Amino acid sequence: AGVMAQHLQTMRNKHAITLEHLRFGALKGLILDADGSVIYNLFTEFGITPKSFQWDIATHNSGFNVGQACRELLRYIEENLQGERMSGVHVFVGKDFFEALVKHDDVVEAYKRYQDGLVLRSDMRSGFTFCGITFEEHRGKATAPGGGVRRFVEDDEGHAFPLGTMDTFATYYAPADFNETANTVALPLYAKQEPRKFDRGTDLHTQANPLPLCHRPQLLVKLEIA
């Protein structure tokens, strides 16, 4: 029983990574296949021009105003909410973007006197807030069926999206392809076992059929280092 449970947990973990990969596709306005290929680009399907901002944060003394750029990002998302409310904006960023941001003079100066600069001496990668926007470094990655490794967020970019909206994102599930699951409400994960001939072992099968989707891709914004 213990060995069986370990195998099931390993299979569950693989499904969780796949779901994370698909959800990051939704954050980019894409419906992805398991191998990372694009099935549908929602910007193309709905005739929406993707929005991106160039942040010149890697060049020292560039004069780039991070606070002004944050307010510009907030105003763009607020405008495209079209009357809906949000509780905040979150940005998943890659390591190069994060390093450039936390080393920028505007950010350093803002946190220098807060708790005697404790934040600057701490590991901020799990998230810090600047001008009403929370920035979090994301290091997640997945292995494709062919063996290649894909990062969910590229090192020099970020992906911004609103929090607390009613219907921006959803994850739909389809039932497993078993006789007993036809015309039933889908579950997030299915697991079955079947004994081998002459009781010489047990075969395990797990299945998940998720479809993470962004209903309003115009609220998704890409940030890039200029």
Which residues make up each language-model segment?
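Secondary-structure junction/capping motif
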Residues: 11, 37-41, 65, 137, ...
